[in-house]
């Protein structure tokens, strides 16, 4: 039986064939940015451009939480810190795009509760980022823990939020 050696990056980091490679940051090109704003200025009212820029800034302020959730090796303590930072960062969940809201909720469900698709699909409609911040204040976990709540606890937590939000 032969094995294929793991691919490595130029800095020696191993890449699993079934995982995406890390994103590379692209520097902002001033000419492209100016051209985009010039075209927008010709086709959109100033107020609408300002609204778009403000929404992009708010989306950008949630990037650290998205990044923490995407890294599967992020300990629960760091996720709790990222949730705390998000809560006090001046951005409300409702300020974000619907896609970002749902993405954050689904990622939080997968990291704290379960990765069962049926559960995630239901939970993302009922649980909010604020719910997970509140949850972090109530659970006890070791500093480097990567675990989740048990199945019964996850189900009871979701059920309590569904009942609380029902008319």
Q: Where are the regions that the model predicts?
A:
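N-terminal beta-alpha lobe that positions the nucleotide/phosphoryl donor
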Residues: 1-167
């Amino acid at each position: 039986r032969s094995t294929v050696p793991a691919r490595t990056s130029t800095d020696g980091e191993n890449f699993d064939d079934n995982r995406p490679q890390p994103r590379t940051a692209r520097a902002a090109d001033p000419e492209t940015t100016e051209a985009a704003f010039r075209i927008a200025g010709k086709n959109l009212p100033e107020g609408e451009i300002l609204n778009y820029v403000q929404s992009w800034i708010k989306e950008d302020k949630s990037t650290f939480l998205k990044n923490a959730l995407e890294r599967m090796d992020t300990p629960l303590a760091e996720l709790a810190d990222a949730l705390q930072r998000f809560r006090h960062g001046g951005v409300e969940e409702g300020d974000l795009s619907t896609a970002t809201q749902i993405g954050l909720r689904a990622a939080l469900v997968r990291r704290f509760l379960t990765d069962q698709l049926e559960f995630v699909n239901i939970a993302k409609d009922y649980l909010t980022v604020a719910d997970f911040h509140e949850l972090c204040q109530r659970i006890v976990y070791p500093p480097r823990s990567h675990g989740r709540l048990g199945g019964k606890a996850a189900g009871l937590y979701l059920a309590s939020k569904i009942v609380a939000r029902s008319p």
